[in-house]
Structures are given as structure tokens and as C-alpha cells.
């Protein structure tokens, strides 16, 4: 997640001194694609008294070559480019949805040299209109996930099959890491969903709601 030496380098890049004692505890696995490494760096920066988002973005990029927008207000409401660390767009509020998922396959830590990602520029253009309804969001997220799985694997990824079998509107995956989730309208998740995920090899099962639109 963040070594002692890495923490010292991060603190220096923030204009601070590498001293003091910091304790970080995760409730997400490192390398899972759930922003644990960025969360650790943002937490360390704020504990050291640094709150300026641009300063923290630059420090995260210098530390691991990428970063999630956790240092910004409403990070879930942004289209974000993680390698250059910049906001691409602020689309309309997403509709309410319920996500059930976990982690499938090996964990994969951020590698700044890894550029094997599909082109989803067309999805960026389509995202504002898709936010008008949950089916549109789910369809766009599912196609983005398919492209990533086709390019990066694993070939036996069960997420789409599970989504179809359990009546999900779509599915989503981390472009790096092992995080995957199924998209449901709120209150429609089958009671058997967590057990089905575990039976398919998912770990650290999670369930949460997001979105604030209609």
C-alpha cells in the first residue's frame, strides 16, 4: 500500500518533514482497484496538514504514477483521467442504484508503465446522456467492462454471466485490480446474490447504494 520510505517521499513532496507516527488501516484490499492506495496517500497528506486538492493530486502522481479523485469534492460524480490526474467532465447526477460485488481474480497494484487499456473515449461522450436513466448507465458501464475484460482478462471472468442470471441491469469492473460489481435498481437485489458471488469465486462481498438522480 505505502511503505515507510514511500511515505517519507510523499511527505517531502508535500512540503512536509518525514517525521511523526502514522497508522493506516484499510477496509479494502490493496491492488483491488477500489482506490485503497490513493486513499492511503490522501489520508497521510491530510494528517500532515495538507488539504489543497491540486497539491495532493500532484503528490499522488509523483508517488505511484496515477491517482483517484478522492481529494476532490464529490469524486464519484466526475469523469476522471487517473494517469494525468485531471477532471474530464462533470456529468449530471447518476440515477440511484444498488451495487453488489466484491473481488475476483488476482489483485493487481497500479503500474504507471501499464498502458494496456481499451479506448473508451466514445463512452466519455455518451455518459451525460446515459445519466438520464439507470438502464442507460448500466449499459454503458457494462460495455466498458466488456472491453476491459476482452483486452486484459481473465478469460473466465464470471461477472457478465452472473449479471444475466440474477437479473442485474448491468455490471461494472475496475479497469485495474480485481473489483467487480452488479448493477441493480434499488431494492431489487436477489437474496441469493451474495451466496452466488461467493460460489463464483468472489471475495470480500460488498453491497452499497450510490447516485442521487431520478
Question: What residue spans do the PLM features occupy?
Answer:
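Long, contiguous secondary-structure blocks with strong helical propensity
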Residues: 22-25, 39-49, 161-167
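Conserved active-site and cofactor/substrate-binding residues in soluble primary-metabolism enzymes
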Residues: 2-5, 35-39, 132, 188
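Short beta-strands and strand-loop turn motifs
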Residues: 25, 141, 173-176
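ATP-dependent small-molecule kinase catalytic core of the GHMP/sugar-kinase superfamily
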Residues: 54-171, 183-214
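N-terminal pre-core extensions flanking Radical SAM catalytic domains
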Residues: 176-183
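DPxDG-like acidic metal-binding loop motif
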Residues: 32-55, 60
